[in-house]
Amino acid sequence: MQVILLDKIGNLGSLGDQVNVKSGYARNFLIPQGKVVMATKANVEMFETRRAELEAKVAEQRAASEARAEKLSALDAVVIASKAGDEGKLFGSIGTRDIADAITAAGEAVVKSEVRLPEGALRNIGEYEVSIQLNSDVFAKVNLTIVAAE
């Protein structure tokens, strides 16, 4: 299915690209989220007339994401207290939801879908550098400290 991208999407392309995607991916995910439109003649003409407006919107979103990244990078170490055993191994784990809640409590709103944990959930006491993906190409690093709860 031919679609026109209205936003930068990883592994597909950037604003204005016409790409071929599977019809289920387009119908069930991309179109409902407003990231693409079908590549009909009318939509191609509409896109060309609104191209500057859409590019300005994308630039504005990127600037807002970069401002949030600056605020997140300026945060002091975020501390999470969790029950742990004698050797520093946690009972349970710290996942994306826990990290997002802790950063939000520290003063900057973050949703769990923005938190990136490439090695999976955190299971030990210690200091970690967590990546927050605010936009398709804007990342922020946050220092996270996990301590044993008393």
Swiss-Prot record:
Q: Which domain of life is it from?
A: Bacteria
One Pfam family in the UniProt entry = Ribosomal_L9_N
Membrane-crossing residue ranges in chain numbering: none
Keyword hit for Protein biosynthesis? no
The UniProt keywords, alphabetically, are:
Ribonucleoprotein, Ribosomal protein, RNA-binding, rRNA-binding
InterPro entries reported for this sequence: Ribosomal_bL9, Ribosomal_bL9/RNase_H1_N, Ribosomal_bL9_bac/chp, Ribosomal_bL9_C, Ribosomal_bL9_C_sf, Ribosomal_bL9_N, Ribosomal_bL9_N_sf
Listed GO biological process terms: translation
Name one molecular function that GO assigns to this entry.
structural constituent of ribosome
**Gene3D superfamilies hit by this protein:** Ribosomal protein L9, C-terminal domain, Ribosomal protein L9, N-terminal domain
Q: Which GO terms describe its cellular component?
A: ribonucleoprotein complex; ribosome
Q: Identify the HAMAP family for this entry.
A: Ribosomal_bL9 (MF_00503)
The entry assigns this protein to a family as follows: Belongs to the bacterial ribosomal protein bL9 family.
Q: Give a short account of what the protein does.
A: Binds to the 23S rRNA.
Q: What is this protein called?
A: Large ribosomal subunit protein bL9
